[in-house]
Amino acid sequence: MPFAICAPVVSQYAALAALEGPQDCVSEFKAHYLAARNLMCERLDDLDSIFAYQRPDGSYLMFPKILLAEGKDSMAFCKNLLKKGRVSTTPGIAFGPTGESHLRLSFCVPFDEINKAFDRIRALFV
């Protein structure tokens, strides 16, 4: 029995309209994400005894390495961060064994949310 999977037609028309329509919003999103990325990098730099990272060039996600001994178990580290610091992150182990000792952070949130999260992380570990 032949079987094919493709994007729904309505989604294809929506994608075409988005690509052919005004692109002003793309510049605005790019500027916002760059500023948010830079803010998160500054905040991570301030916690360089806790995290090591590489600055992302094409994603709104970061995957810093946890340098603390308790970071070897990323699941436990993230649960502790959620319970004691009220900061939600994704444990690196969720992305496979090489993700252990890392956590995933997203900077597609408002600047005040980034600052609030890092203020809480700082209070917990510094």
Where are these regions (language model features)?
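PLP-dependent class I/II
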Residues: M1-V126
